[in-house]
Amino acid sequence: PAEAQGTVRLPERRDPVGNCSIVWIPSLSRPSLDSLRYAAKVSDQVIGVWVRSEEDDPAMIRRDWQRLVGESHGIQLHILESPFSSLVDPFVAFVASEEQLHPDVTHTIVMPMAIPRYSFDSLLLNQRGINMQRALDASGNRVFTLVRYYLPA
């Protein structure tokens, strides 16, 4: 389960790294939490971004975030509205906004990617993430990190 590894924390550092990781959070699952943990290791600031659909309850998302991630300094959650059921556009706009607000900081886009046992399953499983990466690639020079999670058999 996602809770098994404990909460996500930024390590204490003497000198800032100069990196902010923006982590796409499609759900509070093991791949997403592994992505947050990776981002915390390589960044001074971590921003988890959840683009919510109409069915998602923001209060429940925040409650689960609090339980799994906690109130760690330097790790934030942003819940974005999804007009017209688009998950890609709000995330791309958020990334562009952060880059514009903080041009002196390197921004790394961290995306969880589930790796299924059978390769043909990956065509459907990660389609949203692939579309997200393509949209972000099209609009500028960005650093991407894919955090892979191999699904059990």
Locations of the language-model features?
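Cytosolic C-terminal regulatory domains/tails of membrane transporters and channels
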Residues: 1-153
